[in-house]
């Protein structure tokens, strides 16, 4: 006996509904779809959200807010302590290093946050820094190089 010979008992298996196979089956003739109408047709039924011609909910509710999606900038976010442990022994962390290690895709702007603590003097290159990250870098004598896009 092995895994390929295992099968459930016949009583436990739910049999599929065989429709349109004679009136004695209980699902013959109209195959459980009733008489005529949109739902009786092949591919019949209404799309999700259709309310029978009534103004649907998503159109009754007003538009809200402003979405500036075209100009939205998504930053790749890294914490100071994580970056310094990842690049242990380096005293300069450049954007090329972050991109070459595939920590984020090339061209994605990078923001450094100030979570955790750092002990070694390090120079970090990024597009943005949080106030806490700048404060912690300057406390240990490190530098933050802000890159203009």
Swiss-Prot record:
Presence of the UniProt keyword Ribosomal protein in the record: yes
Superkingdom: Bacteria
InterPro entries (alphabetical): Ribosomal_uL15, Ribosomal_uL15/eL18, Ribosomal_uL15/eL18_sf, Ribosomal_uL15_bac-type, Ribosomal_uL15_CS
Segments of skewed composition (Gly residues): 23-35, 42-52
Gene3D superfamilies, per database record: 3.100.10.10
GO cellular component, one term: cytosolic large ribosomal subunit
Disordered: region residues: 21-54
Record keywords: Ribonucleoprotein, Ribosomal protein, RNA-binding, rRNA-binding
GO molecular function per UniProt: rRNA binding; structural constituent of ribosome
BP GO terms, sorted: translation
Similarity annotation: Belongs to the universal ribosomal protein uL15 family.
NCBIfam families assigned to the protein according to its UniProt record, in alphabetical order: rplO_bact (TIGR01071)
Matching PANTHER family: 50S RIBOSOMAL PROTEIN L15, LARGE RIBOSOMAL SUBUNIT PROTEIN UL15M
Subunit structure: Part of the 50S ribosomal subunit.
Function: Binds to the 23S rRNA.
Protein's name according to its UniProt entry: Large ribosomal subunit protein uL15
Species name: Lawsonia intracellularis (strain PHE/MN1-00)
């Amino acid at each position: 006996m092995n895994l390929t010979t295992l099968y459930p008992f016949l009583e436990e298996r739910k049999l599929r509904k065989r429709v349109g196979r004679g009136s004695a089956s209980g699902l013959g003739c109209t195959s459980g779809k009733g008489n005529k109408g949109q739902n009786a047709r092949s591919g019949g039924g209404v799309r999700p959200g259709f309310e029978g011609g009534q103004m649907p909910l998503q159109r009754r509710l007003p538009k809200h807010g402003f979405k500036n999606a075209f100009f939205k900038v998504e930053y790749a976010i890294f914490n100071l302590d994580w970056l310094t442990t990842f690049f242990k022994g380096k005293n300069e962390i450049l954007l090329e290093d972050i991109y070459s290690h595939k920590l984020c895709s090339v061209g994605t702007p990078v923001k450094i946050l100030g979570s955790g603590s750092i002990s070694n003097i390090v120079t970090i290159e990024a597009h943005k820094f949080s106030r806490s990250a700048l404060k912690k870098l300057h406390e240990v004598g490190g530098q933050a190089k802000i890159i203009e896009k």
